[in-house]
A protein has these predicted regions:
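Short beta-strand segments
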Residues: 36-38, 60, 94-98, 174-179
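Structural motif
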Residues: 32-34, 55-57, 91-94
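Thiamine diphosphate
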Residues: 26-32, 40, 52
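Short hydrophobic/aromatic-rich motifs at helix boundaries and adjacent loops
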Residues: 35, 52-53, 133
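Divalent-metal-activated hydrolytic enzyme cores
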Residues: 1-31, 64-91, 102-208
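Catalytic core of membrane glycerolipid acyltransferases/transacylases, capturing the structured
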Residues: 41-62
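Gly/Ser/Thr-rich loops at beta-strand to alpha-helix junctions
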Residues: 40-42, 98-103
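N-terminal-biased segments
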Residues: 1, 33-37, 41-43
Length: 208
């Protein structure tokens, strides 16, 4: 932990080199997308996308699971999504699963989670797709994790304020899958119902 503390203590010196960029952030935010992904420490949205401060509104949960929409049971997840869409006017929502996901692995294997009851109960929200997930023994559990992403996309569609915007053509949903061992980002292509690598295009330089 100490290296992290030391870095945080010196971070102010780095912002001093870019005072205008950071001062602008005080004026408000207009993020390009809501990025929903797992809490896994190996998945870093700004690293994957090259996003600078202010460009991504993030929601991270164990296993990038979203709870069912329930107006009687407000959740942090629903509040974050609602704020992104209704207040910030975000027009793109990414759900990004990943390889080697502990949560999806536990679901696929049917692990005994008695010792972590909050995790056990949270994973009941996972709602796998009707076509099921495959416990094929692959340590990367890619098939299961990709199916899991699509299940969360379906769940998002059940959030009424999202459904309204989707119907009006004002919102786009993106299902992504990140391979943590290769750095490859795959995107779901509905016509083929498969995840494929993003075609290479010129990109801007990553933030320093
Ligand atoms: Zn995960």
């Amino acid at each position: 932990m100490q290296p992290l503390i030391d870095y945080a203590r010196s971070f102010r010196q780095q912002t001093a080199a870019r005072p205008e960029e950071f001062a602008r952030l005080a004026e408000g935010q207009a993020p390009q997308a809501l990025f929903i992904t797992c809490s896994d420490s190996r998945v870093i949205p700004s690293l994957i996308t090259g996003a600078r401060p202010g460009e991504l509104f993030e929601l991270r949960t164990a296993g990038n699971i979203l709870p069912p929409y329930d107006p009687e049971q407000p959740t942090g997840e629903a509040a974050t999504i609602e704020y992104a869409v209704e207040i910030l006017g975000v027009r793109d929502v990414v759900v990004c699963g990943h390889s080697h996901c502990g949560a999806v692995g536990a679901l696929v294997r049917g692990d005994d989670l008695t010792a972590v009851p909050a995790v056990r109960d949270w994973l009941t929200h996972a709602a796998p797709r009707a076509d099921g997930t495959k416990a094929d023994g692959d340590p990367a559990i890619a098939d299961a994790a990709q199916s899991h992403v699509l299940a969360q996309i379906l769940r998002l569609r059940s959030y009424p304020y999202l459904a309204r915007r989707l119907d009006a053509g004002q919102l786009r949903l993106h299902a992504w899958f990140y391979e943590i061992h290769t750095g490859t980002v795959l995107a779901h292509r509905p016509p083929a119902d498969t995840f494929v690598a993003h075609p290479a295009r010129p990109v801007r330089a990553a933030p320093p």
